[in-house]
């Protein structure tokens, strides 16, 4: 059995670790609230752009944007959104497992895949599995900015427009609530008509039209690009909210475990100290009896 000095050292070490995890838990909780607010703030913009794009697409059926043209799928682009840092539980593991399953399915059908990595963990994963990475962006920080994402996203959008890929998928972690985050792999392009016009009521509402300057086609082309960019930004915002929630939960679990370990070590320390005192008393009594 370890001596009291060694046990005290272990207790001190675990206490120091608990201070770190507790501080990280509090920081993650603060960042989580900001990330959730950022995520909620991004939704109205994406929804408004969708409404306008849907109105244009419905009122002008003669024009079909390249983003809405379906082709036989032989090549696929995949945008993989992960975190830059670890210590967030199984968040990255879960979304990368979903990506792995999707890659196996696509490759099993003879489909070539080229990827875009958003986040260091995804970049490292794609490098390990030997995936073809055509663009990437890392170190986004706690506040993602669309201008930093656009370059990497545009590579995939241009590849789709030019016919280099026939579909683009988006993999990220969807924020459900503080305790639950769900890995998602969704088709980003081509845009399905029912994704723009989601209800019959919307379809009827969009049957009338505006007068556009310079023309409807130019407006649609610009709006759909902005809409797809907004979808990717929303996915990044959701992923960041999920990251901070998962990190807060993971650090709380680590702090609770450290507290339990400290309690167990304290019990062992007390027993060891009691045994040492009992032994000393026995030796004193034995010595006195011998005299």
From Swiss-Prot:
Q: Which domain of life is it from?
A: Bacteria
InterPro entries the record matches? ATP_synth_F1_ATPase_gsu, ATP_synth_F1_gsu, ATP_synth_F1_gsu_CS
Assigned keywords, A-Z? ATP synthesis, Cell inner membrane, Cell membrane, CF(1), Hydrogen ion transport, Ion transport, Membrane, Transport
Got a GO cellular component term for this one? plasma membrane
- Cellular compartment(s): Cell inner membrane
Q: How does it sit in the membrane?
A: Peripheral membrane protein
Alphabetized PROSITE patterns for the sequence: ATPASE_GAMMA
Which molecular function terms from Gene Ontology are attached?
Answer: ATP binding; proton-transporting ATP synthase activity, rotational mechanism
What biological-process terms (Gene Ontology) are attached?
A: proton motive force-driven plasma membrane ATP synthesis
Q: Name one Pfam family in it.
A: ATP-synt
Subunit and interaction comment: F-type ATPases have 2 components, CF(1) - the catalytic core - and CF(0) - the membrane proton channel. CF(1) has five subunits: alpha(3), beta(3), gamma(1), delta(1), epsilon(1). CF(0) has three main subunits: a, b and c.
What NCBIfam families does the annotation carry? ATPsyn_F1gamma, PRK05621.1-1
> What role is this protein assigned?
Produces ATP from ADP in the presence of a proton gradient across the membrane. The gamma chain is believed to be important in regulating ATPase activity and the flow of protons through the CF(0) complex.
Q: Which family does it belong to?
A: Belongs to the ATPase gamma chain family.
The protein's name in its UniProt record: ATP synthase gamma chain
Supply the source organism for this entry.
Cupriavidus necator (strain ATCC 17699 / DSM 428 / KCTC 22496 / NCIMB 10442 / H16 / Stanier 337)
State the gene name recorded for this protein: atpG
